[in-house]
Amino acid sequence: MTTPTTMTFFDRFEADILSGKKTITIRDESEKNYVPGTTVQVSTFEDGREFCLLEIISVSPILFSELSCFHAEQENMTLAELKSVIQDIYPGIQQLYVVSYKLVR
């Protein structure tokens, strides 16, 4: 397993990441290999435009059914919005991973 050095987000999340309002991302099993303490270059999914560096704080497994208002707050969304976004991106996936991070620059 190689440690990931990049991460992409839909461009609609850029402002929340840069303002510190979004402090986690929820990913599927294909993106569970981020390593706490490492720094990743972040770019937009749509066009690959780099916009910041994030330090990975933790990676924790979670089931879709365990998502709570706490997770939604860290994503700067309501719980209903969060569940809808997750279902759109990862339809039918139950096992997910919470990647917590902090903005480096």
Put a short name on every predicted segment.
Residues 2-105:
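Structured alpha/beta reader/binder surfaces that contact nucleic acids or chromatin modification marks
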